[in-house]
Each structure stands twice: as C-alpha cells, then as structure tokens.
Amino acid sequence: MGGQEIALYADGDRLVVDACCITGRQDTLFLGPLPPHEVKPGGFIGPKQYAPRRVGRQYFRRCRIEGDVDFIFGGARAYFEGCEIRSLNRDMDVNGYVTAVSTPKGEPYGFVFHGCSFTALDGVAPDSVYLGRPWRECAQTALIDCWLGRHIKREGWWDWNKPAAHSCAQYAGAILHGPAGDTTDWVPWANKLDVMAAAGYAREQVLAGADGWDPEGGDGDAVETAGLSANGRTVHIETYCEDEPALRARLKREGRSAAFARQTPADFEAWKIATRTRLCDVLGLSLMDRAPNEIR
C-alpha cells in the first residue's frame, strides 16, 4: 500500500483542530500554503495553486496523526500540542519521514511540536524513520519536550539531497525523552536547544502574529508528556478513543437528563455552567471552563 493519501488539506488562518484522529499513509496532513512553484512538473499543487501564498496559523491539540512518508507537510506556522505522531510500517530500510516542511524564507516559525509523542506501530524497525526532510530549503521544525520512540533515526533529519538546506533549514530540539531522545548523533546542521532557547517556542509566541492570537487564551496546563505509557502514547489518546460506544451512550443519557426546563435568564446562566461541568466530567477534561460562554 502506498501513494499519496491526504486526509486533511488545511489552508487558512487561526485554524484549531482538537482531539481528532487524522490517518493516512503518504502525505496525510497538508498545512498550507503551497510553495510558490513546483520543483518539477507533476509535483504537488493542490486546489489553491493560483491563490496568493499566505502563511496561516494552525493549532493541533490532543490529536493522533499517522502515516509513513512526509505525512505532515506544508508551509504553515503550525503548533502541535500533546499529540501522538504515529509512524506506520512500509517494510523498507528507510521506513518513512514524519515531516516535509516548506516554510517560506524569512518566516520566524514553521512546525513546532510541544509535548508530543512520536510512536510507531508494531513492526516498524528501530532507527528507520527520519523526523523530517526539507520540502523547501528553509524548512523549520522544532521539537520541545517530546517523547521519541526507538523507530526514530539517530541522526534525526535528512537533507533530501539539498545542500542549501544546511544553511537555511532550521531543525531544533530540546528536552527530549524516550529511546531516541538523545540528540548527540543528530546531523551537525540541526540545533540542540537549551531550556532558555526552548522558551522561545511557547505557543502564545509562535501563534501570536500581528493580532496576538492564542487559541488557549493564556498559559496552558501541562501536557501529558510526563505521564506517558511505556510505548509513549499520551494519556488523552486512550481517554478519547477507547470504548466509544459506551461514551456515546453516556453522552446521550446525559443530554436527555440535562435538557433546560426552567424559564428565567438567571436559570439559563446557571444551567450553562452546570452543563459544562457535567460535560467536563464525562470527557475527563479540566479546560472547558477557561473559555467564556459566547453567543455565536
């Protein structure tokens, strides 16, 4: 099984994807914009090939994203927080590449993974998957406080036979954990950041732009990296994906019993607070009370 399998084509600004499973093989998740031009005729172009290239900000939280070759790719300014990045097996010496980034030259950020776990299905060989290769020479990818499974190659990154990437691309890592968390053997043109430098990749800084956007509205709770299971999968994946029929049944029961049956505006405000609290309890969340209730 091979070839391009795009599950999500995302090209826009202030995009938020929360608690989703995005699955494919090659080129699973595209984060626009496209590069200005194809490298060669017949290359990837997409439906917005004639549109102006505008770098959008995109936020992925508590998601599972899986594939084999270049399965997270594009030129967006993207922040992945508390996600599982899962590599699939294709039975080759080089089993895959996680990212293929095309950050436009001069952009301050590309892809940032914070508190994510890089895992693999059974059968994926140790030391067989690159963290990334540059779709364009100035690709930017940073890993902060992430867990790396043994399938990740010791050298970390490949230049895709693009020598110019050695001086333009920015690949960086800090506070990495797991079997492949040691960056000693990373390629010399990748950066090993200290804790102070890693602070420059905070979500509210990476995604701020000109309008100060922060999809979480301020400092977030700690991600689940510290509570990883033996295989590196974050706790939220189990919470959101296991026993789905039982979860649906419980949500249906809660929905029937929580219907608003009073009359006054004060009753309605109290009902909203109580309902949100009940939903937090069902889903095991502690963050829903952070955002104010708004009429949309």
Regions found by a protein language model. Give the residues of each.
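Sequence-level preference for short, compositionally simple segments enriched
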Residues: 1-222
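A broad, low-specificity signal for short, low-complexity segments enriched in glycine/proline
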Residues: 43-46, 103-108, 229, 273, ...
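Extended hydrophobic/Leu-rich segments
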Residues: 196, 223-226, 235-237, 272-275, ...
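Mature N-terminal, pre-catalytic/accessory segment of carbohydrate-active enzymes
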Residues: 221-258
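Non-catalytic accessory segments flanking enzyme active sites
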Residues: 245-296
